[in-house]
Structures are given as C-alpha cells and as structure tokens.
A protein has these predicted regions:
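Extended, helix-rich architectural segments
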Residues: 1-188
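Charged, low-complexity, helix-prone segments enriched in Lys/Glu/Asp/Gln
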Residues: 19-43, 47-49, 137-150, 230, ...
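A structural detector for beta-sheet-dominated domains
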Residues: 21, 36, 49, 78, ...
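Generic low-complexity segments that are intrinsically disordered, proline-rich and/or Lys/Arg-biased
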Residues: 55, 86, 93, 111, ...
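Solvent-exposed, flexible loop/coil residues
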Residues: 116, 141, 153, 200, ...
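Extended, regular secondary-structure scaffolds
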Residues: 142-268
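Extended, charged amphipathic alpha-helical segments
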Residues: 247-370
Length: 370
C-alpha cells in the first residue's frame, strides 16, 4: 500500500493510482443533483413532484344511463373526468439570498493594499493588475463566491498559455523589470471548477492537513458527440492527465512552471441556504394553494332560489323572474379572511433572510431607510 503522493504516482496500474488519488479527499463529494434541484426553481418539488402535488381531477361529464333498444337493457356510461393543472409557484429564494451575499462580499472589487518602494516594484504591480484585468478577476470572484455558497466547493486553477499579445501593450514600460532583452511569450490564465460545471474535485491532503495535490474528474465531449471521462492531477511541479474510454490512456505529463501548487480551493460542509429550505418549500406550497383558492373563489357566483317563471328585459339587461316561497337571488362571495396567509408568508420570508443574515434590498424595504 502506497504511503505518500510520490508512491501513488509511481504505481503502474492507472486505475489503482486514480483510486488512491481520490482517497486523498477528506470530505464527502457534494451531491450535485440535490444541490441543483434546490438551486434551480424549475427543479423544485412543487414543479416536478406530481405525486406529492398532483393535478386536480375535475368532472367533465356526469354518468348517465342509456337504454339499448336492440337488447332491451339499460347500460350506465361512466362519468368522464379531465385533469386540470394546479398552480405551481416556485420561488428562487436560494438564488436571491446567495446573489445578495455575493454582492456584499465581492460586489466591490477587493483592492490591493501595496505601496511600491521603487519604480521596478511599481511596474511589477502594474503587470499583476494587468493579469487580473485580462482574466476578468472582478467577475470571476463573484462566480467563485456564488459557487462556494451554493455548490459547497469551488477551485480556481492558474495555468500558462502561449500568447505574446498580452505583453505588447506595456512591454516597453516593464521590460527593464523583467530583464529587458526577451519579451515573454506566455500569458497567465485562470479557470473555475465547480460541481455545477460538471467537475468532481479531489483535493489531496497529507497527514498535516496541507493540500499537496489536486485532482479533477470531468467529461470531455468529442466531435462525434461522444463523451470521454478525463482525470487530471496537479502537484507542486507537474500536471498528469488520463482519458478513460475503453481503458485508461495516459497523456504526456508536463511541468506547469510554478514554484507551488497553482490551485486555490474553497469548501464548506453544507450549502449556505440549507437551513432555510423548509421555509422555501412551505412558501411555495402556501402560495400555490392560495392561487388555486383565488382561481376558484374570487369571482362571485349568482345563487337563484325559487322557480324560474320567465325572463324580462333585453338580452344585455335581462332579469330572471323567480316565484315560489322564499324566492331570492344573491351572490355567493368568498368571505374567508386572508390575514393568516399574509402573516405566514411575511413571517417565512423575514425568517429566511434574517437566519442567513441577508438584508432585503427590495424597493419597499429600502424606501423607509434613512
């Protein structure tokens, strides 16, 4: 049994090697499907679970008895029913809370507090800022925070690619800082990995809890629309890659050129909004059922009591003439108070935001703020 990372990478059996690299992860893999069902409002159970929230069965035609003259028997035709869809209102509550938290965390771009001591350091700082700008770090930071809060984990991988156009704009200004003779032909780039992007992440920790390698399993789509499972491992010096189709096939490993592991990894044991999921489920059920009540009871019905003797007036203003004892006509209106429903909805919304320490930034909430 291999004892360290070097021994694992030296194993001749690729399948065994990958299995050991996966065991370097100390936590359970996030349940991507379950997380996606909570994140995507189109996948909420109020929308997809037709057993728990069935459509309404409505009588379309009553049963009737029919006499068959040929046989002299009477047959009963069964009643016919039709399925009427019920209201299904989903609320993207998790998305709203996570987006607000992301905006308050990195909505304002983090500033680098750095005071260069000489001209070379100033030029080096300009180069670092240019790298961040070309990689759109301002926007990638938001994606990272959003993924970390909703998907439990995210990783940012930095790598080098051939591209001399990056240095064309400011090479004259910084060439003395970088030696001054040969213009670099490489460019720093970064990419985000997370469960919703189809990645299974396997950070490899040693006994001291230090991440000494990082692996990623993903599917690559080929030109013929077939998919190949790929596994890559990054260490402090090298990048190893394997493809799995009929069997494992190893690609040529290469040195990434950095003095340390070029991966930033963030993990949390549960999604940020797990504690308020029951609130969201109750809200969706409450609003959907209330919408059905409004559809069926909002418009008043005319109740006629007595014998209809005739009609008077024109078609537009026609009146019904009722006779008999207790003859009357009145509208049936829905007199149920909706205060309890309103109170529960407002309470659940307020608790969902307060328990996640998330400010409500709607116009109504902010209108009274000083």
């Amino acid at each position: 049994m291999p004892l360290n990372l070097e021994e694992i990478l030296a194993l001749p059996d690729i399948g065994q090697k990958i299995n050991y690299l996966k065991k370097g992860r100390k936590t359970e893999l996030p349940d991507r499907c379950k997380l996606w069902d909570d994140w995507n409002p189109e996948r909420h159970e109020i929308i997809v679970d037709k057993e728990k929230y069935p459509d309404r069965k409505v009588l379309d035609k009553e049963s009737e008895k029919v006499f068959d003259e040929k046989t002299g028997k009477t047959y009963e035709i069964e009643a016919k029913y039709k399925t009427e869809p019920v209201n299904r209102i989903s609320i993207p509550l998790e998305q709203d809370i996570v987006n607000i938290q992301t905006a308050f965390t990195v909505g304002t771009e983090p500033s680098m507090d750095c005071t260069p001591t000489d001209d070379d350091e100033k030029k080096l700082l300009d180069a670092v800022k240019a790298v961040f700008k070309s990689n759109k770090i301002k926007y990638q930071n938001k994606k990272i925070v959003r993924a970390w809060l909703s998907e439990q984990e995210a990783a940012e991988y930095w790598y080098v690619t051939d591209d001399d156009s990056f240095w064309a704009k400011f090479w004259k200004k910084v060439k003395t800082t970088f030696g001054g003779k040969v213009k670099p032909t490489k460019k720093l780039k970064s990419v985000l990995w997370s469960p919703f992007r189809g990645d299974k992440l396997y950070p490899f920790f040693n006994d001291e809890g230090k991440m000494i390698a990082f692996s990623r399993e993903y599917k690559k789509k080929l030109m013929d629309d077939s998919e190949v499972t790929c596994f890559m491992t990054i260490t402090d010096k090298m990048v190893y890659q394997w493809d799995l189709s009929k069997g494992y096939e190893e690609r040529t490993p290469f040195a990434h050129g950095f003095p340390k592991l070029p991966v930033l990894y963030a993990y949390r044991p549960e999604p940020y909004c797990k504690k308020i999921k029951t609130f969201r489920v109750r809200l969706e059920k409450l609003l959907s059922n209330y919408a059905d009540c409004i559809d069926y009871h909002f418009f008043p019905l005319l109740k006629l009591i007595g014998d209809v003797e005739g009609f008077m007036g024109k078609v537009k203003d026609r009146m019904v003439k009722l006779t008999g004892e207790g003859a009357d006509a009145q509208y049936l209106t829905w007199n149920q108070a909706n205060d309890t429903v309103k109170f529960e909805v407002e309470t659940l919304f307020e608790k969902a935001y307060s328990m996640t320490n998330t400010p409500q930034i709607s116009f109504e909430k902010l209108s009274g703020a000083g």
